[in-house]
UniProtKB/Swiss-Prot annotation:
<dbReference type="GO" id="GO:0006412">
    <property type="term" value="P:translation"/>
</dbReference>
<dbReference type="InterPro" id="IPR042105">
    <property type="entry name" value="Ribosomal_bL31_sf"/>
</dbReference>
<dbReference type="InterPro" id="IPR002150">
    <property type="entry name" value="Ribosomal_bL31"/>
</dbReference>
<dbReference type="GO" id="GO:1990904">
    <property type="term" value="C:ribonucleoprotein complex"/>
</dbReference>
<dbReference type="GO" id="GO:0003735">
    <property type="term" value="F:structural constituent of ribosome"/>
</dbReference>
<comment type="similarity">
    <text>Belongs to the bacterial ribosomal protein bL31 family. Type B subfamily.</text>
</comment>
<comment type="subunit">
    <text>Part of the 50S ribosomal subunit.</text>
</comment>
<dbReference type="InterPro" id="IPR034704">
    <property type="entry name" value="Ribosomal_bL28/bL31-like_sf"/>
</dbReference>
<keyword id="KW-0687">Ribonucleoprotein</keyword>
<protein>
    <recommendedName>
        <fullName>Large ribosomal subunit protein bL31B</fullName>
    </recommendedName>
</protein>
<dbReference type="Pfam" id="PF01197">
    <property type="entry name" value="Ribosomal_L31"/>
</dbReference>
<keyword id="KW-0689">Ribosomal protein</keyword>
<dbReference type="GO" id="GO:0005840">
    <property type="term" value="C:ribosome"/>
</dbReference>
<dbReference type="InterPro" id="IPR027493">
    <property type="entry name" value="Ribosomal_bL31_B"/>
</dbReference>
Amino acid sequence: MKADIHPDYRQVVFVDSTTGAKFLSGSTAKAQGEVEYEGQTYPMVRVEVTSDSHPFYTGKQKINQADGAVDKFNKKYGLN
């Protein structure tokens, strides 16, 4: 392997911008600062959506079921 071509892999804390939740994980993402997590200082990366704020994981998901072509035809011509 060539030397000095691989990104620096390290422990990073991802911070959810919406909820403020913190997740420690390994990453090569560029840090946007530092944050203290469980008594240690780690590089920090802010993210907009995590499992703590995504509607699928929080149970606040809205399901929009689109009508198919047959349903639209039946509604248009009153064939229900």
